[in-house]
Design a protein with these regions (language model features):
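Positively charged n-region of N-terminal signal peptides that target proteins for export
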Residues: 2, 41-45
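Short stretches within intrinsically disordered, low-complexity N-terminal or propeptide regions
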Residues: 17-18, 30, 192
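Carbohydrate-active catalytic/glycan-binding domains of CAZyme proteins
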Residues: 25, 36, 61-390
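Bacterial N-terminal signal peptides
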Residues: 48-57
Length: 390
């Protein structure tokens, strides 16, 4: 007869939560050790698989984000905001279309992230173009100025939004206008340079009856001003305008004043574009703006205020850049070097170009040389130049 003890199969109970193995029947010590080791190995495998899942979820093994060099992406009117250790580059869809504004960031001005939207216009804003976005830090917030264009509004239109008005010609004798469309400078606010930006009002801050574009911010004696262009399409000869603003930048507090007109120097065209103001430490208030010059095409001009105030008078209109590029702005690199940013060529293949600027007693020195190449490059602070700006 077979011994009774062999009719029973030992039962092994494993309690994983207590990290122990309970043997219901006696087994040799070597068997218990083997089983316990297998349990520990299984736990380690499960823990490793769980950790791997978490790491993949967090993107540790994801491909690094793509960066772009300046010659790899199209952009018009490139506006750079240095903030902290980061440069912010704002852009809209070039030429026409678009429903908002995007930003790219960089640490070195050579390599830029992919663009992220910082402004999405409300669905009921039926614009046809978004132009020339720029962001200014003022009164503890970030303010985005951009130009919106709309389809023409008929005088008897009943379904047009209240912020759109018919545009009537205001042509000077001897000048021809262009296509008359509602166009104005809208202002948006955010707590961060990366948005989201929200409108300070529904509609343009510039007069609704005027075709206006390219608004920029200048603060003088604590008062914010908008400098903007009254379009040549409506006036014939483009006008550079300025108006003081309310503290929340939602309205003008006085009627706009005229600073100068496009055809203010020999050979100049009738376009006023892209004003930007700066006051170097040892000289007066200066402005750069864009027009067309005979024999040069689209260009950047510079001028200076005789009084040192925004109201001018403005004089010494001279070329700064004359190689079919324009709508410039000036910013200070992290090392203090002043830089000119513009788009070039003035076509649908435009790219952002950067040039170091030198300041002399008579204005910014010409910068018609080739743009900075790839990689870090520094321009020495030579005689007659300044790094600091107010």
């Amino acid at each position: 007869m077979r011994p009774l003890r062999f009719l029973f199969t030992p039962v092994i109970k494993i309690t994983a939560s207590q990290n122990s193995t309970e043997i219901c029947y006696n087994l040799p010590t070597s068997c218990r050790d083997i089983i316990q080791q297998k349990v520990l190995d299984m736990k380690k495998l499960i823990h490793s698989l769980f950790s791997l899942t978490v790491l993949v979820t967090l993107g540790v093994y994801a491909e690094p984000a793509k960066t772009w060099t300046r010659d790899e992406f199209q952009i018009r009117d490139p506006f750079v905001l240095p903030d902290g250790d980061t440069y912010y580059l704002y852009e809209s869809k070039p030429w026409s279309g678009g429903k908002g504004v995007a930003v790219r960031t960089s640490k070195d001005l050579d390599h830029w992230t992919d663009k992220e939207m910082v402004l999405l216009l409300p669905p009921d804003v039926k614009n046809t173009a978004v132009w020339a976005p720029e962001v200014h830090k003022y009164d503890g917030a970030y303010w985005l100025f951009t130009t919106l264009t709309f389809d023409p509004v008929k005088p008897d239109a009943k379904d047009a939004p209240s912020y759109l008005k018919p545009i009537q010609p205001m042509l000077e004798q001897g000048f021809k206008g262009g296509n008359l469309q509602p166009r104005g400078v809208w202002v948006f606010r955010s707590k961060s340079p990366k948005g989201p930006f929200k409108p300070v009002k529904m509609g343009s801050v510039t007069p609704a009856e005027w075709m206006c574009l390219d608004g920029t911010l200048w603060v003088e004696d604590g008062v914010p001003w908008m400098v903007f262009c009254h379009e040549w399409c409506q006036t014939g000869n483009g006008r550079m305008m300025a108006a003081p603003m309310s503290k929340d930048l939602s309205r003008f507090t006085a009627e706009p004043i005229e600073l100068f007109r496009a055809a203010c120097i020999p050979g100049a065209g009738h376009v006023t574009d892209g004003p930007f103001l700066m006051k170097p430490k040892s000289s007066g208030l200066r402005m750069i703006w864009s027009n067309f010059l005979k024999g040069s095409g689209y260009c950047v001009l510079q001028c200076q205020s005789k009084s040192g105030k925004i109201t001018g008078p403005w004089h010494m209109h001279t070329p700064l850049y004359t190689r079919d590029g324009g709508h410039g702005m000036i910013f200070q690199r992290h090392d203090g070097q002043m830089m000119l940013s513009l788009h070039q060529p003035n076509s649908k293949n435009e790219r952002m170009k950067l040039y170091p600027l030198q300041v002399t007693w008579e204005g910014f020195s010409r910068c018609d040389w080739d743009p900075l190449g790839p990689g870090p490059r520094r321009v020495p602070n030579g005689r007659g130049t300044e790094k600091g700006v107010e």
